[in-house]
């Protein structure tokens, strides 16, 4: 079920800890004392753009437009994304919560929060969880989706363990903290 107006552009604004950018950036932060700095990067050519495009198109069966703006923040780990979506006519926030709860009902590591819950990367540190919150916009035809993960667990080793468990038919949480 498509819940968004597919003629509109999705805006994805992601804030990431510098651990996800590699050793070079970690050294740059340390050497140049950039711990009080926030910076955007990879606007038109970020390495995840093609993956985002692929998954959006696969889910909707058509070409989608989106803008992905990643930012490096002065924190070591975690990713907090804010996603702005235009709704399809007749869709409201309660329907979206229903769809998300149905879609992820058997996923131990995806947690759907109550409407308008503000998320923090601290909510997921040292977990394999992805927290999702759907928030109301001041416009009735738009929503704001928040998601938070620990990029060193869910974005790395924890996701690899979960995928291996799924591949070999183990319980997906085997070896992971739930």
Language model region names:
Residues 5-7:
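A short alpha->loop->secondary-structure connector
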Residues 9, 13-14, 18-145:
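C-terminal substrate-binding/catalytic lobe of Rossmann-fold NAD(P)-dependent oxidoreductases
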Residues 1-3:
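Short, small-residue-biased leader/transition segments that mark boundaries at the very start
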Residues 131-132, 136-178:
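NAD(P)-dependent Rossmann-like dehydrogenase/reductase catalytic/cofactor-binding core
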């Amino acid at each position: 079920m498509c819940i968004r107006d597919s003629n509109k552009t999705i805006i994805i604004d992601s804030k990431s800890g510098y651990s996800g950018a590699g050793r070079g950036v970690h050294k740059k932060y340390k050497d140049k004392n950039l711990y009080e700095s926030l910076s955007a990067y990879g606007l038109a050519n970020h390495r995840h753009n093609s993956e985002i495009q692929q998954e959006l198109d696969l889910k909707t069966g058509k070409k989608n437009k989106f803008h992905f703006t990643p930012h490096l923040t002065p924190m070591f780990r975690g990713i907090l994304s804010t996603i702005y979506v235009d709704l399809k006519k007749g869709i409201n926030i309660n329907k979206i919560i229903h769809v998300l709860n149905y879609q992820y009902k058997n996923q131990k590591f995806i947690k759907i929060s109550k409407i308008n819950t503000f998320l923090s990367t601290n909510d997921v540190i040292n977990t394999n969880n992805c927290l999702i919150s759907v928030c109301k916009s001041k416009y009735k035809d738009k929503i704001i989706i928040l998601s938070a993960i620990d990029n060193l667990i869910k974005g790395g080793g924890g996701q690899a363990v979960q995928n291996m468990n799924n591949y070999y038919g183990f319980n997906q949480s085997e070896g992971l903290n739930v």
